[in-house]
């Protein structure tokens, strides 16, 4: 695991994550101390992770003057693929790894969690949905509101 990737777990990184509207992944993260790293780190992938990664990049740069962090925004699949192929050092994804991706030797590390809201029309008789019901709607298993019980 790269130093830059593990540093996101440090107390300062988790505070940045929380300050940007995400849920911290590690409530007990230790304080970060620079290890004197030098060079360039390329981070690429998910557009939904990019804003918080830019904030983490700023904080990391302050603590590590000899490191350049380049953040490339695309999508989760591109981020994972580029990490597998070595085009980037850290891939950003806003989803779990597919089994086929995990088999290629990359490791997923959750740095934050975000909330997703499902909004229903005000005239709908449905006023509450379970996660299973939302899944069934989006996978096509449930196609009629009348089937929601």
Residue ranges and their predicted role:
Residues 1-5, 9:
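Single conserved hydrophobic/aromatic residue that forms the stacking wall/gate
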Residues 37-141:
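N-terminal segment of the mature folded domain
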Residues 13-14, 126:
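Internal amphipathic alpha-helical segments of the cytochrome P450 catalytic fold
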Residues 8-9, 30, 37, 117:
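Hydrophobic transmembrane signal anchors and adjacent membrane-proximal interface regions, especially
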Residues 14-42, 142-149:
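N-terminal hydrophobic or amphipathic helices and topogenic motifs
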Residues 6, 14, 135-138:
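Non-transmembrane alpha-helical segments in soluble domains
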């Amino acid at each position: 695991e790269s130093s830059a990737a593990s540093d996101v777990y440090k107390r300062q990184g988790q505070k940045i994550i929380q300050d940007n509207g995400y849920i911290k992944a590690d409530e007990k993260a230790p304080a970060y101390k620079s290890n004197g790293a030098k060079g360039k780190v390329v981070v690429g992938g998910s557009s939904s992770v990019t804003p918080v990664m830019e904030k983490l990049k700023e904080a990391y740069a302050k603590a590590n003057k000899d490191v350049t962090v380049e953040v490339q925004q695309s999508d989760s699949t591109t981020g994972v693929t580029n990490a597998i192929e070595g085009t980037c050092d850290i891939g950003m994804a806003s989803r779990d790894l597919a089994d086929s991706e995990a088999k290629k030797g990359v490791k997923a590390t959750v740095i934050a969690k975000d909330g997703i809201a499902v909004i229903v029309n005000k005239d709908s008789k449905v006023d509450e949905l379970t996660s299973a019901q939302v899944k069934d709607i989006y996978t096509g298993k449930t196609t009629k509101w009348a089937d929601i019980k």
